[in-house]
């Protein structure tokens, strides 16, 4: 019901109802049967008229009848017939009176004024609606910045973990706002702007909120997209209004989230030099450069895309200081987990540092989601504390999504998936530079039918050519296992091939790791599709070089593929034995996998109650019947195994 009162239909309904009552007030309808002039003449001739009032204004005759007693009627008459009417009344000896211009003045005034008053009232109502808030029509030129209330819950630097360098830089901002004379005495000038940049989920907005909670000065928060509208000049007007508010409340802080929405490199796109976004950027440049030292206004901005920002925005005098907020290392992840587990009941055996080691590449948002998922799982099962089981399942949910235990797979597809995943695991296990295998499963998660997770033992910032080669070989281990065991390949390796081809292309064209082509970069980096500085780029190499690049990419991929096949051919017995165990057990953990590879039996690894898997001989590929072709999976998804890729996170092969 509240939605109806706020909708546009409500004022329209009010106007219709008021107009109806006004019409009824001005022209009230008669009740009873119609009384016409001929009926009046009949009553007059029969002597049934008791009295009459002749109203010259409106040409109406008010008649009072004898029977029914004192019943009154109004009837119109022709003005030219007035004298004749009066004569008839005199002849019939009817008492009558004549009313001239006398009338109800208030009613006449209301007749003319009421419609106008209704229109004025409706117009005022509309104006109040469109001017009521920052998002209304008549407020286009006003800034949409939200001022942080003093009474709102505060976030301090104590709530920020894993970004010590960024906290140190921003802590200096707080000190300047609290005690500017300390810096001015040494002739220091505080940075007018601080740009926070880094991957999504690393805590850039959280840092800005912490500054707001610590500084104790007015804090204005706005998004870059709030400046851009379809109307010309709105963005520039909002920028001016924002800085006017800031100057009136100095010292203060302005925080602009996702500044790349308005600060993109000028000249990009199809808008030309008079693009509305560019006019907004020009006004922002003028306002930032127009600061005076006494204003004590500091602007903090956050973005995931510093590479597309206009150089004029990043020059000294505007954003003097640029702070990188990167993914936390193991120590940082441990501190972040301590923050997010604060106040949550954890089991005694949980080791936060060990948990941080299991989450390489996780951002602060990922870790917060991990802990929340674990808490939800514990509550779902009726536990009173969060155990290691829920935390490990939370890691898997963040990486690959929830389990799909109800997904129905045929026995043939399940067998192919198991051998595919075991191919990844065995190749990764026997290669020196591949990341250790952490978990293997044929239980689907998300859109994948199975997965193999490999985790680095420590955070890595550089990768060698040998490590890239081993990683590609491990990625192709699933396809190699299908070829060796089944003599056939499936669509499950489609994403494997995509990842391997991309890595080989980077090695040749970006990293200079091709012995034939040498240390040289070819072409432009296409990994940033939103740069927008150029719609198309031309290759800076000849067709002959392009052919050599293709040959090198093919050679690198085939080398990795052959390496995977050689390893699996040598360890074919382990591939068959452990894959059959995986089909039966569905999931094999790291320690169990390593024990099985070392030659231990299933009973020794899983317990005495386990029986060895049945020895089911695999028929040659030429003797197996072919099933009816099935629809191909969507591009990039696994057809027979999990081929999910999360950059900077544990590898799923």
Swiss-Prot record:
SMART domains according to UniProt: AAA
Primary site of residence: membrane
Ranges of compositional bias, category Pro residues: 611-620
Binding-site positions, ATP: 198-205
Record bears the keyword Chloroplast: no
Keyword Cell inner membrane appears in the UniProt entry: no
Positions on the Cytoplasmic side per record topology: 1-7, 127-653
GO biological process terms, semicolon-separated: protein catabolic process; proteolysis
Lipid bilayer topology: Multi-pass membrane protein
EC number(s) on file: 3.4.24.-
Entry GO MF terms: ATP binding; ATP hydrolysis activity; ATP-dependent peptidase activity; metalloendopeptidase activity; zinc ion binding
Note accompanying the cofactor annotation: Binds 1 zinc ion per subunit.
InterPro entries: AAA+_ATPase (IPR003593), AAA_lid_3 (IPR041569), ATPase_AAA_core (IPR003959), ATPase_AAA_CS (IPR003960), FtsH (IPR005936), P-loop_NTPase (IPR027417), Pept_M41_FtsH_extracell (IPR011546), Peptidase_M41 (IPR000642)
Keywords, alphabetical: ATP-binding, Cell membrane, Hydrolase, Membrane, Metal-binding, Metalloprotease, Nucleotide-binding, Protease, Transmembrane, Transmembrane helix, Zinc
Extracellular side: 29-105
Binding-site residues for Zn(2+), renumbered to this chain: 420, 424, 496
Localisation per UniProt entry: Cell membrane
Active site: residue positions: 421
GO terms under cellular component: plasma membrane
Classification via Pfam families: AAA (PF00004), AAA_lid_3 (PF17862), FtsH_ext (PF06480), Peptidase_M41 (PF01434)
Record function comment: Acts as a processive, ATP-dependent zinc metallopeptidase for both cytoplasmic and membrane proteins. Plays a role in the quality control of integral membrane proteins.
Similarity-based family: In the central section; belongs to the AAA ATPase family.
Quaternary structure and interacting proteins, as annotated: Homohexamer.
Name under which the protein is recorded: ATP-dependent zinc metalloprotease FtsH 1
Species whose genome carries this gene: Conexibacter woesei (strain DSM 14684 / CCUG 47730 / CIP 108061 / JCM 11494 / NBRC 100937 / ID131577)
């Amino acid at each position: 019901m509240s939605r109806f009162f706020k909708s546009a239909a409500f004022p329209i309904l009010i106007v219709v109802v008021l107009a109806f009552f006004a019409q009824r007030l001005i022209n009230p309808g008669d009740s009873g049967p119609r009384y016409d002039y001929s009926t009046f003449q009949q009553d007059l001739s029969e002597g049934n008229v008791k009295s009459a009032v002749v109203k010259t204004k409106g040409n109406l005759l008010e008649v009072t009848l004898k029977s029914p007693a004192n019943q009154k009627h109004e009837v119109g008459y022709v003005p030219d017939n007035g004298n004749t009417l009066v004569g008839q009344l005199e002849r019939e000896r009817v008492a009558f009176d004549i009313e001239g211009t006398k009338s109800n003045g208030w009613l006449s005034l209301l007749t003319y004024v009421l419609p106008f008053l209704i229109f004025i009232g409706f117009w005022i109502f509309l104006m109040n609606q469109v001017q009521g808030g920052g998002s209304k029509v008549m407020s286009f030129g006003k800034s949409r910045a939200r001022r942080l209330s003093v009474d709102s819950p505060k976030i301090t630097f104590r709530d920020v973990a894993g970004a010590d360098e960024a906290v140190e830089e921003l802590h200096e901002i707080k000190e300047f706002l609290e005690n500017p004379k300390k810096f001015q005495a040494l002739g220091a000038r505080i940075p007018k702007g601080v740009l926070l940049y880094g991957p999504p989920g690393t805590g850039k907005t959280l840092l800005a909120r912490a500054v707001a909670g610590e500084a104790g000065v007015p804090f204005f928060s706005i998004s870059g997209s709030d400046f851009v509208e379809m109307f010309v000049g709105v963005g520039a007007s909002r920028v001016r209004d924002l800085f006017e508010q800031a100057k009136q409340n100095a010292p203060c802080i302005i925080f602009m989230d996702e500044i790349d929405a308005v600060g993109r490199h000028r000249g990009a796109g199809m808008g030309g030099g008079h693009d509305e976004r560019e006019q907004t950027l020009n006004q922002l440049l003028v306002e930032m450069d127009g600061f005076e030292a006494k204003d004590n206004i500091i602007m903090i901005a956050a973005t995931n895309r510093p590479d597309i920002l206009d150089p004029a925005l990043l020059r000294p005098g505007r954003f003097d200081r640029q702070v990188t907020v990167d993914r936390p290392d193991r120590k940082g992840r441990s501190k972040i987990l301590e923050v997010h587990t604060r106040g949550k009941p954890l089991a005694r055996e949980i080791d936060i540092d060990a948990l941080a080691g299991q989450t390489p590449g996780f951002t602060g948002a990922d870790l917060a989601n991990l802990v929340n998922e674990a808490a939800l799982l514990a509550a779902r099962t009726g536990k009173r504390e969060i155990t290691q089981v829920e935390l490990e399942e939370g890691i898997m949910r963040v990486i690959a999504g929830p389990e799909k235990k109800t997904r129905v797979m045929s026995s043939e597809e399940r067998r192919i998936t198991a051998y595919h995943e075991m191919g990844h695991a065995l190749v990764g296990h026997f290669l020196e530079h591949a990341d250790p295998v952490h978990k293997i499963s044929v239980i689907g998660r998300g859109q994948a039918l199975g997965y193999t997770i490999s985790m680095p033992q420590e955070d890595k910032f550089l990768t060698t050519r040998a490590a890239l080669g081993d990683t590609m070989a491990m990625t192709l281990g699933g396809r190699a296992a299908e070829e060796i065991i089944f003599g056939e390949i499936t669509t499950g390796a489609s994403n494997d091939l995509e990842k391997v081809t991309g890595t080989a292309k980077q090695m040749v064209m970006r990293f200079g790791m091709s012995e034939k082509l040498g240390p040289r970069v070819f072409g432009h980096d296409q990994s940033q599709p939103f740069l927008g500085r150029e719609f198309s780029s031309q290759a800076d190499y000849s067709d002959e070089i392009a052919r050599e690049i293709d040959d090198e990419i093919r050679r690198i991929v085939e080398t990795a593929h052959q390496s995977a096949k050689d390893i699996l051919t040598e360890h074919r017995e382990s591939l068959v034995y452990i894959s059959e165990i995986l089909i039966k057990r569905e999931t094999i953990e790291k320690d169990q996998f390593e024990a099985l590879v070392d030659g231990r039996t299933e009973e020794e690894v899983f317990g005495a109650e386990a029986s060895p898997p049945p020895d089911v001989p695999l028929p040659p590929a030429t003797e197996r019947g072919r099933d009816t072709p099935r629809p191909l999976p969507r591009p990039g998804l696994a057809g027979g195994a999990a081929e999910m890729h999360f950059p900077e996170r544990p590898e799923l092969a």
